[in-house]
Amino acid sequence: VQEEKAMQAVPTAPIDASKFVAYVTERRKKRILFKGEYLMINRSIDMNKCRCEVGSTMRERNPYADTLPYDYNRVILPRLMCDENSHYINASYVNSWLREKAYVVTQAVRTKPMNVEFWRMVWELGSNCIVMLTKVFDFMKVMCLQYWPLTRFTFGDIDVETIDTHTYAHFVFRTFRLTRQTTDGTETRTVKHFHFTEWELDSFPYISAFIELRRRVRQYVEKNPVDAPIIVHCSNGAGRSGAFLAVDANLELMKKTGQLDVYEYAKTLVNSRPHLIDSVDQYQFIYEVLAEAVMCNIQPIQMHQLKDRSSMYKAKKNRELMESQDSHENKLLLHLTQPLRIGDCAGGHRLENRGKNRDVMVVPPDHARPYLQTLHGESKDYTYINAVEVDGFTRKAEFIVTEWPKHSTIDSFWTLIYDHSCHTVVNLSNQGNPRHYPTFIHNKGKASYGPFIVEVINYHQYQAMTSHMVKVMKRVFDRDGWPIPRRSFQTFMISDIMSNAANNQQIETEVRICCVIQVRIWPIENKVPLSTTGLMDVIKMARSWKRRAPDRPESKPTIVMSHNGVSRVGVYIGANICIDQMDIDHEVDVFHAVKMMRINRPQLIDMKDEYKYLYDLMLHWYMTNPEYRIHDKDDAEGEEGSRPSSQSQSLRDK
């Protein structure tokens, strides 16, 4: 009965963008309303129109037999003389709100013959944009073959060359050059590949990352227009692809008409290809993505606009405008930051771990905390430390945020460095009362911390910081649990090493080299540093060491810590994210950097002081790095007539 009532409550007209967030909020309270829409969508399938007679006879060309293209809108390739079935590929045309055949949805490449067919389809369609919504491997299962070359390869009569690759935390963007011999000679085309790596099996991705992917795709398509569809695929060419199409088509509709119509477009999807809307959860996810996109229409700004933004605080009228803007962004961040539930942080709330937390309200979620291994058997839960992984701009879990260790957790702190091969520790707090903030590193010589021997190789004092270059070595124990002297360990017999497993004997020769940077220019009573210069020097030193450190530091995390693991660390991580964005994309997006940082630690960044300081920090970085100036002219020219800046856009939206 409830389902029947819900099915009668489906929307009958497009929804104004100004009312869309409230509409989704109301439906979120009564989830059965989403189910009602979903059931009505499936009832709308025209069985006379949606037939799969051709695809059902091509079993070897369909890795997923339950997702076949409908006959009326399938992609038909030119037939090859050597293969009578070469006209067939598991791909379907799908209309958007504004354009027919705006997309082609296809399945993942699963065999080598499909590899050739895929690139032939890309060429015949004339597409210059491919969106990939699946990983190559997911949970030890091959989801899609790597159908692109690392450098260059020929598929059939099409030569594909990978020109460049840009890796980000949640996606990888590649540029391909396709070359083919035609009757008119050699023809060359450029194709952009947007690979979303965030969407794992049986889960949904971060909404912010999904919106950013769509923004990048749309930005590229608008700058490089061709009369050809966007090719979209996941593993089976169904639900994930449908979600991307629904979001993109409705945001394009909103851009033109100021309205969204998820329900009617979902009916278009299910009549275009099977399972493009494949569950109530996926359907609700589409609504959630669109609601956040509508509510949070704040775009990156060009680097040269940082100076304009900073100068607006000087005049009273403009300062009030900017303060209003900051307040608006603060409210958005508070609304969009999902609080962590106790169940999300079960490890930190266990009885044996409560004493390891300085604040029971600041506990890491289990899915994003770094687990320890070395202290096996030392305590009931030896894996726990109050630390959390935070994504950077180019890599997931690029940073580990933690608090100043307690007397009882100093061993765990060094275990964190050793077990996760951390090459850099940035401590943003000065030592307070030693009773509460014990010394965890010495200035010279060797010292023991639990199972580790830490040797200070170099110690330097600078105006803004001190730095300890340390070598972290794990102690070696014999079969009776006694430390082995280093000299006798070096002469250990091969037979003893071979019997190690049987005797539970610990033998460890690997060491870690780590740079511990201690900030000196951030007084304990100050919310932000006295200036931007000192913190810039700290960031430069840490980034310089990361480039020089041994053992592939680009793949190892940086530990960022403060007295409570909340204040200060957001400024440092946010600055690094924005610097990488400036280096790679020549734009700045402080708002979304903060939003992504808060996913695993919602308390990061104090909006009153740290948020504005982060903008000041980025302006200082921009002004002191002349190499950014070469992009200013191009950015300013491309900006005219294009998207509005962050502040002007969001103020209009209010």
Q: Predicted segment positions?
A:
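Cys-based phosphatases of the PTP/DUSP/CDC25 superfamily and their flanking regulatory architecture
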Residues: V1-K654
